[in-house]
Amino acid sequence: MTNKLFEGGSMPGVGPIHINEIEPTLDALEKVLGINLKDNVLGSVGKKEFSGDIDVAVQVAPEDIPQLVKKIEASPLVLDMAKSSVIMTKVKIVDYDQSKQTTKPRTGFVQIDFMPGDPGWMKTYYHSPSQEESKYKGVFRNLMIATICAMLDRKSSEEKIDDGRPVEVERWMWSPSDGLVRVKRTPAPRKDGKGFTKKNVDVRIQEPIKDPSAIAKALKLNTAKDLNSYESLKAAIEQNYPQDMVDKILASFAKNGTVRDIGVPDDIPVEEPKTESLADKQLNRIKELLK
């Protein structure tokens, strides 16, 4: 077995797994590891016919991770392993059905990433709606929540530093490890005491919120169901927020680089940058000269 970090977080020789193969594969691993895996899968696993990989949340103390790694290494199903912030493995698919194929090549092996942390919270944070519930992947849902957090109940000081940042901001943050967190953000001072760096310092000012119902209440939504997808979030803010706040959130969401790369949802109007024709440029230049 190799034990190194592969570039891009991807193990060699792995491919998609069919939905019917997920349970027997995880069953076999559960017997070896002695931990619940099936109830702690993250994202869209099991919600569509094929999954590119499997992410599993594992409740394990930091000091017990080496022991978990040894158990994983000992499994005959695990052919390769790499460690970073997660434990990445190449696992033999149990009951592999070669007749089931998809757009990406299938190899009989799937990547399973073991992610140490709080399974309950990670299932909330990494939640991905089913294909019947949303046209968009879970990343859109998370980016929408993060955009709401950046703007809802944001309190900025009138005083600003030289680069235009407020001296102090109170805001929500959507944290993959801590939950929904209320923080006080200040510009990070330079070590020499002369001004500030481009970084910020976030100090938690309230206890983190991890319960979905409490998160929905803090974000002034209706119920935890509103957190399900991009569509449910958009409908909830349109129902509960002032129109100017809705417009700001949707405009900021549409400008996000990841959203633009994947494709801005059809129900958000996108302002295309205005382009000047050569004739317009020449006319404007003449007007400038005549001033």
Predicted regions and their residues:
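Intrinsically disordered, low-complexity eukaryotic regions enriched in glycine, serine
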Residues: 29-32, 60, 81-88, 256, ...
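Helical scaffold of the NTase/Pol beta-like nucleotidyltransferase catalytic core
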Residues: 1-42
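Catalytic cores of NTP-dependent nucleotidyl/adenyl transfer enzymes across multiple folds
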Residues: 104-273
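Intrinsically disordered, compositionally biased, charge-dense segments
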Residues: 1, 7, 266-291
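Short secondary-structure junctions
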Residues: 33-42, 68-88, 154-163, 169
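Active-site nucleotide-donor binding segment shared across nucleotidyl transfer reactions
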Residues: 26-66
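Residue-level detector of alpha-helical secondary structure
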Residues: 30, 73, 234, 250, ...
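Conserved catalytic core of two-metal-ion nucleotidyltransferases
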Residues: 73-122
